[in-house]
Amino acid sequence: MLFLLSELSGTLTPLNVFRYITFRTGGALFTAGFFVFWFGPWIISLLRLRQGKGQPIREDGPATHLTKRGTPTMGGLMILAGAVVSILLWTNPRNHYVWVTLAVTLGFGAIGFYDDYLKVTKQSHKGFSGRFRLLLEFAIAGAACLLISIYSPAGLQNQLAFPVFKDALLNLGWFWVPFAAFVIVGAGNAVNITDGLDGLAIVPVMIACGTFGVIAYLVGNSFTAGYLQVNYVRDTGELAVVCGAVIGAGLGFLWFNAPPAQIFMGDTGSLALGGLLGAIAVAAKHEIVLAIVGGLFVLEIMSVIIQVASFKLTGKRVFRMAPIHHHFEQKGWKEPQVVIRFWIIAVILALVGLATLKLR
């Protein structure tokens, strides 16, 4: 919204600053962070009052987790509120990619909210039907990908770009929309599964958002895209502002989610943030790079898939417990060790992902 002030720069020259993506990204980060930090205590108190027993804790999980009983969930509401307010304030309201990304984020957030609501009210780990949940996610992601395909440059519609290889594009044709929808749904559920320890998911999400904020900015600028020899995707630079807002909201949330957590993100936040990352990667034509940058999330969801498949096929478990962060807890790692070491992995993978921009 503030972007529109730049149109008055002919009369008031200082207003031209609102034209710059870098300035608005910084503004979005600060605004979202301040919003969550300021309203966080009130939201936590309200959720604690409404939820009573809070998020149910797995009885078969690590014994140390039993002390977390009574901690409220749905903290994703804090993140989404701060991020959305900031995004609406600082982005260009005429940008299609911003609205599509917001739709995915809020749609996935609504699904996660309902799932959290059922878990809290029933005091059970089972929300609503997994198949129905996936159906809703694919419906939202499919519609978003169809719009992204329409808004994409003519030469890049339905194309899958490969990192490192110059001008390497694979025309997926009609299959691109379901493929891209799978990327978004997969990202949403991968982040959702990662969110099992205090601070474990939110920091890698912020790292991934920072990385894709840079990627979106570079591929959305014709000069930098040409210099790096990557595909120029017009208007995606505005998604850097979205990433800035999410990072700010994430920092505000981390203040309250740092161990011992005062609130959990819940499916409300994790599903929404994962969907957001997937949507940005799809819009910027860097779907494969998302698997690198978000490699930690891939590892987490693959550990669950492997565990379930192995048990059904052989009756044996590969890991002591899945997702894999619980496996390391069962091996004797303390929760802070698991969290910080996984953060380190996330930073390394983000750097590798950024390096693919230069390697051509």
Swiss-Prot record:
Cofactor: Mg(2+)
EC numbers: 2.7.8.13
Domain of life: Bacteria
Pathway annotation from the record: Cell wall biogenesis; peptidoglycan biosynthesis
Cellular component terms (Gene Ontology): plasma membrane
Pfam family, one: MraY_sig1
Location relative to the cell: Cell inner membrane
Coiled-coil boundaries: none
Reaction catalyzed: UDP-N-acetyl-alpha-D-muramoyl-L-alanyl-gamma-D-glutamyl-meso-2,6-diaminopimeloyl-D-alanyl-D-alanine + di-trans,octa-cis-undecaprenyl phosphate = di-trans,octa-cis-undecaprenyl diphospho-N-acetyl-alpha-D-muramoyl-L-alanyl-D-glutamyl-meso-2,6-diaminopimeloyl-D-alanyl-D-alanine + UMP
Enzyme class at the top of the EC tree: transferase
Keyword line: Cell cycle, Cell division, Cell inner membrane, Cell membrane, Cell shape, Cell wall biogenesis/degradation, Magnesium, Membrane, Metal-binding, Peptidoglycan synthesis, Transferase, Transmembrane, Transmembrane helix
GO function terms (MF aspect): metal ion binding; phospho-N-acetylmuramoyl-pentapeptide-transferase activity; UDP-N-acetylmuramoyl-L-alanyl-D-glutamyl-meso-2,6-diaminopimelyl-D-alanyl-D-alanine:undecaprenyl-phosphate transferase activity
Transmembrane segments: 27-47, 70-90, 98-118, 134-154, 168-188, 199-219, 239-259, 263-283, 288-308, 337-357
Function: Catalyzes the initial step of the lipid cycle reactions in the biosynthesis of the cell wall peptidoglycan: transfers peptidoglycan precursor phospho-MurNAc-pentapeptide from UDP-MurNAc-pentapeptide onto the lipid carrier undecaprenyl phosphate, yielding undecaprenyl-pyrophosphoryl-MurNAc-pentapeptide, known as lipid I.
Protein name: Phospho-N-acetylmuramoyl-pentapeptide-transferase
Organism, as annotated: Methylorubrum populi (strain ATCC BAA-705 / NCIMB 13946 / BJ001) (Methylobacterium populi)
Name of the encoding gene: mraY
